[in-house]
């Protein structure tokens, strides 16, 4: 439509206005700017603007679309005629005629099919590397027996005898010295302008049947939970002559027993013994791409975080990969014998003096200092580990 002004602003309302508030404000403004009463320049355009705002905000479905998507949600979903159809303009003349000209209109055009949503659950690995999935989608499809017309084969729909094929019923009233014309959707043909005398036995005259279709979905590498994949034309069938709706596949990535995800980085945790942390060692770490050797320096404190470069998840747009961040957790010895305790405390005493049990000096202090410098790096993934 022509106006791009906020509909609530046009009617002087807040966004939490009730249906009664909307109707009351519209009638007040419509009486003020109706062209039959107000001959000032711009009055007719103003009347059209407030009528458009009322037509949208008085319809719960259109209002919800507007509240969520603004004018884009209305212009992309409804034709100009659809915006006004069904609104209660009684007492203010033929709004359709004022906007679109002429004293008669044709029936409403065929409507596209409804969009559908399918929730697809995939594994952590499938999201990381991409996958092809076959899904079964229940939807309405065009009836093959009547080719979507709704009429028994060999027959065809007839012009509606009630509205003469216009899809609308016009009612004229006289009051206040003026003639008012209101228009409503024909209840016989429901605005289509045609009636089916001999319905198709397969679809009962609807032109559509319920069916389940197998569809292949290509999930790209790097996909994440909440991502929506649009499959054009795979929604419900539309009216005859209108396109089908679209299918939106919403992805849900299942939790992994080892890995977590932060953006494109993979987070994991591995346990090490006190001896491994104190003396240093090489350990094998699980990644999405197999096991990788990782060095644990001598004197590594618990909760230290190490980075394994490019072992994370591939970016959706490009060939870059994230990293894997590995937090090591030192397992505390339990149920030690008396001799084991004595040896353990001897090791602690050696480490506290800047030595490790192997006799090399200074490595404990060096790695303690390195760990302190790495705290900012650890904070980046702290929430992921603690969640």
Curated annotation (Swiss-Prot):
GO annotation, biological process: chaperone cofactor-dependent protein refolding; DNA replication; protein refolding; response to heat
Any Gene Ontology CC annotation: cytoplasm
Binding-site list for Zn(2+) 2: 160, 163, 186, 189
Domain of life: Archaea
Key words, A-Z: Chaperone, Cytoplasm, DNA replication, Metal-binding, Repeat, Stress response, Zinc, Zinc-finger
UniProt subcellular location: Cytoplasm
Zinc fingers (CR-type) by residue: 130-212
Residue sites binding Zn(2+) 1 per the record: 143, 146, 200, 203
Zinc recorded as keyword: yes
Coiled coil: none
Gene3D superfamilies, A to Z: DnaJ domain (1.10.287.110), Heat shock protein DnaJ, cysteine-rich domain (2.10.230.10), Urease metallochaperone UreE, N-terminal domain (2.60.260.20)
Molecular function in Gene Ontology: ATP binding; heat shock protein binding; unfolded protein binding; zinc ion binding
Subunit: Homodimer.
Function of the protein: Participates actively in the response to hyperosmotic and heat shock by preventing the aggregation of stress-denatured proteins and by disaggregating proteins, also in an autonomous, DnaK-independent fashion. Unfolded proteins bind initially to DnaJ; upon interaction with the DnaJ-bound protein, DnaK hydrolyzes its bound ATP, resulting in the formation of a stable complex. GrpE releases ADP from DnaK; ATP binding to DnaK triggers the release of the substrate protein, thus completing the reaction cycle.
Name this protein carries in UniProt: Chaperone protein DnaJ
């Amino acid at each position: 439509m022509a106006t791009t002004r906020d509909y609530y602003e046009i009617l002087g309302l807040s966004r939490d206005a009730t249906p009664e508030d909307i109707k009351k404000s519209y009638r007040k403004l419509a009486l003020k700017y109706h062209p039959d009463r107000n001959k000032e320049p711009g009055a007719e355009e103003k009347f059209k603007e407030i009528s458009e705002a009322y037509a949208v905000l008085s319809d719960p479905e259109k209002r919800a679309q507007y509240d969520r998507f603004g004018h884009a949600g209305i212009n992309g979903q409804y034709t100009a005629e659809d915006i006004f159809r069904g609104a209660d303009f009684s007492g203010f003349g033929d709004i359709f005629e004022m906007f679109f000209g002429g004293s008669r209109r044709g029936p409403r055009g065929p409507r596209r099919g409804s969009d559908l949503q399918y929730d697809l659950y995939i594994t952590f690995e499938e999201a990381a590397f991409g996958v092809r999935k076959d899904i079964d989608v229940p939807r309405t499809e065009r009836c093959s027996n009547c080719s979507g017309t709704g009429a028994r084969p060999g027959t065809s729909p007839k012009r509606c005898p009630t509205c003469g094929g216009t899809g609308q019923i016009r009612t004229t009233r006289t009051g206040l010295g003026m003639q008012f014309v209101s228009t409503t959707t024909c209840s016989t043909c429901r605005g289509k302008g045609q009636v089916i005398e001999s319905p198709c036995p397969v679809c009962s005259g609807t032109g559509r049947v319920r069916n389940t279709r197998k569809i292949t979905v290509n999930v790209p590498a790097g996909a994440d939970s909440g991502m929506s994949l649009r499959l054009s034309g795979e929604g419900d069938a539309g009216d005859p002559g209108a396109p089908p709706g679209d299918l939106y596949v919403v992805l849900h990535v299942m939790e992994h027993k080892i890995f977590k995800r932060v953006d494109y980085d993979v987070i994991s945790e591995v346990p090490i013994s006190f001896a491994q942390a104190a003396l240093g060692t090489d350990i094998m770490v699980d990644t999405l791409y197999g096991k990788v050797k990782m060095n644990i320096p001598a004197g590594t404190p618990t909760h230290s975080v190490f980075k394994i470069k490019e072992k994370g998840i591939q970016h959706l747009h490009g060939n870059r990969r994230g990293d894997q961040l590995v937090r090591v957790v030192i397992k505390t010895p339990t149920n030690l014998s008396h001799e084991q305790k004595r040896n353990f405390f001897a090791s602690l005493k050696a480490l506290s003096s800047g030595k490790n049990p192997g006799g090399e000096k200074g490595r404990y202090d060096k790695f303690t200092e390195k760990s302190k410098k790495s705290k900012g790096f650890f904070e980046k993934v702290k929430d992921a580990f603690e969640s």
